Each structure stands twice: as structure tokens, then as C-alpha cells.
Regions:
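Short, glycine/acidic-rich hinge or "gate" loops at secondary-structure transitions
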Residues: 109-118
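N-terminal, intrinsically disordered, polar/charged segments of Gram-positive cell-envelope systems
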Residues: 245-266
Length: 272
């Protein structure tokens, strides 16, 4: 986890090695998989681990919970700009992210650097995480901003983490899909959906938590960490504030035998 700007604990591969990737290097992220594939647990584990290992001055999250089911445990955390349940409330927050990217772009030009991480005091990384982004496909204003983040967000410290159960041929625009180069997919129902996810091997997966990781064009089978809501809530509660306004901060189930717990990983990590 050390030395990485946005460390993503993906899972253990067949050699027994834990794959920890830096999203700042791997670019924007797409997670896919059918119900029961382990996708929700993986997202929960990724968000929780980043909150535990990074300060609010280092990373901020904008969360879209379009199924009303996944991100409630992240409310009132100093790392979280807000949790938004529908397109109407999400749009103005994404518009503010777009304005912040523009501000940061001007700052980079003024300072003659290519990335915010080259600045002496960089602003926090912004991670826009939207569960079931497919529900926004008919919202052109939102999708335009999401695509813009995918194109220019990296140098400005803004990243996408998008999830959906499965795709169809028109679910994501070509430009956006091409920019989601960091991919993890659980079980897909058929070869068509596996192909659209970009990971053809995902149709052959038959175990909960078994997924295909693709980075820099290379695929490998991994077993992703297990993190249920109760455990995540217990880890996060000490960080919560009594009250938190949901406005964006802008500067000026039982474990199965083949699953492993992120709690064990966190307990072994040095604090600080």
C-alpha cells in the first residue's frame, strides 16, 4: 500500500501473490459482474481500505448509490463529499467536479507541471464512484461529465470507479469505454456480455469472488477480498463525524472457504 497514490487491493492470484495496483498509474476503473459474483464486496473493500489508509486531505470520494443499497455506510465520513441516490442530486456535484478539474488544469498550466502530484502541496485526489452507472445512460449531461473525467481527469487528480452488472452494446460510449482500462470482472452470464465487459474469460468463472483482473492489457484470475457491510461499518464508524453536509469539497453473509477477509489484512498493516 505504501508508495501508491490510490492503492487498490484487487485480490490474490494463482501464485498466491496479493495484487495491489495504483489507480493513478492504471487509470480509470470498470467493475462488472452478475449478482453474487462478489462485485459489491470488492467495491466495499476498495473504498474502506482507501479511507483507512489515506487522510481526507489526500483523497475525497463522490459516491453515486443508484440502487439505494451500497454506500449508506460511507455517509458522515470526512473523506466523503456526499452519497447521492439519483441523477438529479448527482448532477450538480459532478458539475462542481468539472469546475474543479478546470481550476486544477489552469493551475498546472501556471505552474508548468503535468500532474497535480508534482505540486508541492497537491489538492486531494477525487474518486467518483458510481454503482450501477448503467442507470445513468439516458442522462446526457451526466454522461458527458463522466466521459470528460475519463479523458482529462487523470492529470488533474480525478478518477472514475464505475460498476455495473453487465453491459449491452450501447451502455457505454466508445470513448468512455476505451478510457476505462483498469478492469475487474466477475462472472458474466454469456459470451456476449463477457466480450462487452472486455474480459472474455469472465464467462468461465464459477466461484463467488473469483474474478478477472485486467491491467495494461494483461489478464489474470484473482480471488478478491471479502468485506461485508457489518465489518466495513465497524472499521469506519470511528472516523465518522456527528454531522456532515453533503457538499463537494473544492479548494481555493458468511465467509466461504475460498474467501479471505480484508479485516485480517488491515489488522496486519502498520498504523500511520
Amino acid at each position: 500500500m505504501k508508495g501508491k497514490i490510490i492503492p487498490i487491493m484487487c485480490g490474490v492470484d494463482r501464485s498466491g501473490m496479493m495484487n495491489v495496483k495504483d489507480m493513478a498509474e492504471e487509470h480509470h476503473m470498470l467493475l462488472t459482474g452478475t449478482t453474487g459474483s462478489g462485485k459489491s464486496s470488492l467495491i466495499r473493500g476498495i473504498l474502506t481500505s482507501l479511507i483507512l489508509h489515506k487522510s481526507p486531505d489526500e483523497i475525497q470520494f463522490l459516491l453515486g448509490d443508484l440502487k439505494f443499497s451500497e454506500f449508506g455506510i460511507y455517509k458522515r465520513l470526512p473523506h466523503v463529499m456526499g452519497v447521492y441516490m439519483d441523477a438529479q442530486s448527482l448532477l450538480p456535484q459532478l458539475q462542481m467536479v468539472a469546475k474543479e478539474m478546470e481550476r486544477r488544469g489552469k493551475l498546472l498550466d501556471k505552474m508548468d507541471v503535468e500532474s497535480i502530484y508534482e505540486l508541492e502541496n497537491p489538492p486531494p485526489t477525487i474518486v467518483v464512484c458510481i454503482d450501477e452507472v448503467i442507470l445513468l445512460k439516458d442522462k446526457p449531461k451526466i454522461m458527458k461529465i463522466i466521459e470528460s473525467i475519463s479523458c482529462i481527469g487523470r492529470s488533474n487528480g480525478a478518477y472514475l470507479m464505475l460498476s455495473m452488472q453487465r453491459g449491452d452494446a450501447k451502455s457505454l460510449g466508445g470513448q468512455l469505454k476505451n478510457n476505462l482500462t483498469f478492469r475487474i470482472s466477475g462472472k458474466q452470464l454469456d459470451e456476449t456480455n463477457a466480450k462487452i465487459s472486455g474480459l472474455k474469460q469472465s464467462v468461465d468463472l464459477d466461484t463467488a469472488g473469483r474474478m478477472i483482473l485486467s491491467t495494461q492489457g494483461k489478464e489474470r484470475v484473482i480471488q478478491v477480498p471479502y468485506m461485508d457491510k457489518k465489518k466495513a461499518k465497524g472499521l469506519l464508524d470511528p472516523f465518522k463525524t456527528k454531522q456532515k453536509s453533503e457538499t463537494i469539497k473544492i479548494e481555493d453473509e458468511d465467509k466461504k472457504a475460498n474467501e479471505f477477509s480484508l479485516v485480517e489484512v488491515f489488522e496486519d498493516e502498520p498504523k500511520g
